[in-house]
From Swiss-Prot:
SUPFAM superfamilies in the record: dsRNA-binding domain-like
Keyword Nucleus carried by entry: yes
Subunit structure: Part of a complex that includes RAD51, RAD52 and RAD59. Interacts with SAW1.
Bias kind Low complexity: ranges: 420-432
GO terms classed as biological process: DNA amplification; DNA recombinase assembly; double-strand break repair via break-induced replication; double-strand break repair via homologous recombination; double-strand break repair via single-strand annealing; meiotic joint molecule formation; mitochondrial DNA repair; mitotic recombination
InterPro entries named in the record: DNA_recomb/repair_Rad52, Rad52_fam, Rad52_Rad59_Rad22, Rad52_Rad59_Rad22_sf
Protein name: DNA repair and recombination protein RAD52
Gene source species: Saccharomyces cerevisiae (strain ATCC 204508 / S288c)
Miscellaneous section: Present with 1080 molecules/cell in log phase SD medium.
Chief localisation class: nucleus
Length: 471
């Protein structure tokens, strides 16, 4: 037998399939595999894409029948102009079959006017390696791209018509695909090893009553519902004299232990951990504990409870995971946790399950207006001033309105002495006018402007008396 096994190991990988591989390599590519790009001038260059040639190599040689090796990558030039990078890169790739046959060739990749330097290097090196891979694979035969250098073949292949491949939804690799039996057994074996060493931080054991004469089985009730309905986190295990029943209960507990660890909420297990003193008080007091004699549901679950019950495992789970916990164990209708429960005493006017704008009809029913006229009334339009009003009444001629938090003050009227000067002695320049901001808080008394008879621009020209001509 050993001699036969040694002969099988020394046997070529391809064996009788080498002729089939050679037959496939001699065939030329169909129009489905050929792509074209614009070359120099108006010419069009035929080529095969990198992902297509990799798929062909896997189909011909097998997924484990060939391998690639990047021998070298060299940067030929790197130019920077106005913050843009241009890179030229050369790569050498070797393709080796399992039989030892290999092909090696060179590839080139360029990137022009790339703003980001890392992206320029990435594109240049990848394109160079892909080009070298395609040139190396074409050395094995026509089916891997060597036929694209035959001009007569390219002239005839353009006339061949073909239908594009249809999209097959059943040929997609989905997460629901079956896994091999070997991987399943390995996974189950690892899970069993993990279950033997549970997480100590996530386990919380309640101390039971130490009285040996007591025959009551204590069950911890966790109140996690807003309406006050208790929910049982984990039922107590019955300690039976029958070894077969005990083994069955232990197996079921180990099977669900991993699921409970996944459903735990880490945010509930840090500051809310129970101390040893609290655990002892919980076991001695009857405030948060129910007995199996009073609860028929618990009595139904543990009919063979003995005088020395085992320590019960108490865990905290999120409200989202409460449904899965309830499905695994029997829980009475009164203790079922309902995550969609809404108290009847609270009136829900807005649908909490959706996110949308509040309709205008709801605001109208609540006498809420969406108009903003009252806000805009506090600001004056552009180029205008707010009217001097206080409580919708005009102020007197001797009252001026101040800021919003100031009391109107009384001012004395300003007397103008326009009649004190004769028309000839009137000022030659226009009186200065004080600019008032439209939204200013302070009020400025309105000074009547005296209209001048003549307005001069620049320096006035006044002749002296002796230079005047006699009239």
């Amino acid at each position: 037998m050993n001699e036969i096994m040694d002969m099988d190991e020394k046997k070529p990988v391809f064996g009788n399939h080498s002729e089939d591989i050679q037959t496939k390599l001699d065939k030329k590519l169909g129009p489905e595999y050929i792509s074209k790009r614009v070359g120099f001038g108006t010419s069009r260059i035929a080529y095969i894409e990198g992902w297509r040639v990799i798929n062909l190599a896997n189909q011909i040689f097998g997924y484990n029948g060939w391998s690639t090796e990047v021998k070298s990558v060299v940067i030929d030039f790197l130019d920077e102009r106005q913050g843009k990078f241009s890179i030229g890169c050369t790569a050498i790739v070797r393709v080796t079959l399992t039989s030892g046959t290999y092909r090696e060739d060179i590839g080139y990749g360029t990137v022009e006017n790339e703003r980001r330097k890392p992206a320029a290097f990435e594109r240049a090196k990848k394109s160079a390696v892909t080009d070298a891979l395609k040139r190396s694979l074409r050395g094995f035969g026509n089916a891997l791209g060597n036929c694209l250098y035959d001009k007569d073949f390219l002239a005839k292949i353009d006339k061949v018509k073909f239908d594009p491949p249809d999209f097959d939804e059943n040929n997609l690799f989905r997460p629901t695909d079956e896994i091999s039996e070997s991987s399943r057994t390995n996974t189950l074996h690892e899970n069993q090893e993990q279950q033997q060493y549970p997480n100590k931080r996530r386990q919380l054991t309640k101390v039971t009553n130490t009285n040996p004469d007591s025959t009551k089985n204590l069950v911890k009730i966790e109140n996690t519902v807003s309406r006050g309905t208790p929910m049982m986190a984990a039922p107590a295990e019955a300690n039976s004299k029958n070894s077969s029943n005990k083994d069955t209960d232990l197996k079921s507990l180990d099977a669900s232990k991993q699921d409970q660890d996944d459903l735990l909420d880490d945010s509930l297990m840090f500051s809310d951990d129970f101390q040893d003193d609290d655990l002892i008080n919980m076991g001695n007091t009857n405030s948060n504990v129910l007995t199996t004699e009073k609860d028929p549901v618990v009595a139904k679950q543990s009919p063979t409870a003995s005088s020395n019950p085992e320590a019960e495992q108490i865990t905290f789970v999120t409200a989202k995971a409460a449904t899965s916990v309830q499905n695994e164990r029997y829980i009475g209708e009164e203790s079922i946790f309902d995550p969609k429960y809404q108290a009847q005493s609270i009136r829900h006017t807005v649908d909490q399950t959706t996110s949308k704008h509040i309709p205008a009809s709801v605001l109208k029913d609540k006498t809420m207006t969406t108009a903003r006229d009252s806000v805009y009334e506090k600001f004056a339009p552009k180029g205008k001033q707010l009217s001097m009003k206080n409580n919708d009444k005009e102020l007197g001629p001797h009252m001026l309105e101040g800021a919003g938090n100031q009391v109107p003050r009384e001012t004395t009227p300003i007397k103008t002495n326009a009649t004190a000067f004769p028309p000839a002695a009137a000022p030659r320049f226009a009186p200065p006018s004080k600019v008032v901001h439209p939204n200013g808080n302070g009020a400025v008394p309105a000074v009547p402007q005296q209209r001048s008879t003549r307005r001069e621009v620049g320096r006035p020209k006044i002749n002296p008396l002796h230079a005047r001509k006699p009239t």
